[in-house]
């Protein structure tokens, strides 16, 4: 397993924004499961993923598939009292850092709960005023 993926498996669920940031390429692109937009840049993506780590509970990776630069990491978690499953689709760049990170999840009700919880957290985080240009 690639060292970046191995480390990611340990830090994402903890919401450790600094540790997550160390795994991201400068121009990383992140596609969340809650809307069809893309976050671009190490700082905003680390901030989003840091918040996710605090919204999810009982998070664990179930299966890891991939080799080289392309990886799929299947997970399960809770959002409040709702169960969810998802997959992190990750592409590593030439430097071995995460260049592209896309999350797909189900069921729909859990994704809605994630969106609501994330909106509440992001609205209270003043850094996101500066990150508005990172969303396209």
Model features per residue range: what roles?
Residues 2, 27-29, 80-81:
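Short hydrophobic/aromatic segments of transmembrane alpha-helices and their interfaces
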């Amino acid at each position: 397993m690639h060292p970046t993926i191995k480390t990611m498996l340990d830090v994402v669920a903890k919401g450790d924004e600094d540790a997550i940031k160390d795994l991201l390429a400068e121009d990383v692109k992140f596609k969340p499961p809650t809307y069809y937009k893309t976050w671009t840049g190490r700082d905003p993506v680390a901030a989003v993923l840091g918040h996710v780590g605090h919204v999810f509970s009982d998070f664990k990776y179930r299966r890891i598939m991939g080799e080289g630069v392309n990886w799929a990491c299947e997970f399960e978690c809770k959002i409040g009292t709702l169960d969810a499953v998802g997959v992190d689709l990750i592409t590593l760049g030439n430097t071995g850092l995460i260049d592209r990170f896309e999350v797909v999840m189900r069921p729909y009700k859990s994704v809605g709960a994630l969106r609501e919880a994330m909106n509440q957290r992001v609205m209270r985080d003043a850094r996101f005023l500066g990150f508005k240009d990172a969303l396209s």
